[in-house]
């Protein structure tokens, strides 16, 4: 999720340049987004997890995160899960596609290419959104947590139990298996961990541009990036954002 901040700065640069207005409807830049009552959602709601699009309730193929068009088309068609602006809900993975599609619509570049050109290269950051082949040897595997996997495996067993009889974690486990729920749509659609709990070590995951979750880089690069933001938005003559934007 550290990648979310890097993705957000890409779109904020376009705001700073006057190419995007935070109070304009998203649909002004992304017309298909207006479906299902979303025509008035302002750009600023995408930044602060208030758009009501924390997940997709239509079941998605397991490899949907590796196909940008599938994800953004699903989000464009999705009905908000609450009235936009009235509630906050963590957009665990969709955050990156919402921000990233705005960047693509306005700049004409994928967010990975935009980030590399406008931020990573100027600051000499060893960080990527969508890992190139020649960087694979620098990446170490991660060890997955099996708790999320077990909750998903157990979820079908809870289908026969009325939800009102379950509390706390047990109710959450039941929701995980149902993409029509907020928890299920946000964290288990597509069902990647069922297919492969080691998916984050796969070639497909590393090469994909998933701006909310799969940036690859060094701790030094992350520290440098956020250090620039915390010290006014400029370093060594490289301008990232104005202080007022930060």
Where do the language-model regions lie?
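Penicillin-binding protein/beta-lactamase superfamily catalytic region
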Residues: 133-246
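Generic alpha-helical structural context detector
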Residues: 44-48, 73, 224-227
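Short glycine/serine- and small hydrophobic-enriched flexible loop segments
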Residues: 12-17, 97-105, 224-231
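A glycine-rich, coil/turn loop motif that links secondary-structure elements
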Residues: 32-40, 87-92, 215
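Hydrophobic (often cysteine-bearing) scaffold residues that line and stabilize catalytic clefts
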Residues: 2-3, 7, 91, 95, ...
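Active-site helix/loop module of the DD-peptidase/beta-lactamase fold
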Residues: 2, 16-54, 58, 77, ...
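Internal, well-ordered domain-core segments that constitute the primary functional module
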Residues: 58, 73, 86-104
């Amino acid at each position: 999720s550290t990648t979310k901040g890097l993705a957000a700065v890409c779109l904020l640069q376009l705001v700073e340049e006057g190419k995007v207005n935070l109070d304009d409807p998203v649909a002004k830049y992304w017309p298909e987004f207006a479906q299902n009552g979303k025509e008035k959602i302002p750009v600023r709601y995408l930044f602060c997890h208030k758009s009501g699009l924390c997940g997709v309730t239509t079941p998605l193929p397991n490899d949907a995160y590796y196909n940008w068009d599938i994800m953004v088309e699903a989000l464009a068609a999705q009905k908000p899960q609450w009235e936009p602006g009235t509630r906050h809900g963590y957009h665990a993975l969709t955050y990156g596609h919402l921000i990233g599609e705005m960047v693509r619509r306005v700049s004409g570049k994928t967010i990975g290419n935009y980030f590399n050109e406008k931020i990573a290269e100027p600051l000499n950051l060893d960080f990527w959104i969508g890992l190139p082949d020649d960087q694979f040897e620098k990446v170490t595997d991660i060890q997955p947590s099996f708790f999320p996997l077990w909750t998903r495996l157990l979820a079908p067993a809870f289908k026969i139990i009325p939800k009102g009889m379950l509390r706390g974690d047990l109710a959450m486990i039941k929701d995980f298996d149902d993409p029509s729920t907020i928890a299920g749509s946000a964290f288990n659609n597509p069902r990647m961990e069922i297919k492969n709990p080691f998916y984050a070590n796969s070639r497909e995951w590393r090469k994909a541009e998933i701006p909310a979750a799969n940036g690859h880089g060094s701790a030094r690069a992350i520290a440098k990036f956020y250090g620039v933001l915390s010290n006014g938005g400029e370093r060594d003559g490289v301008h990232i954002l104005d202080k007022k934007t930060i």
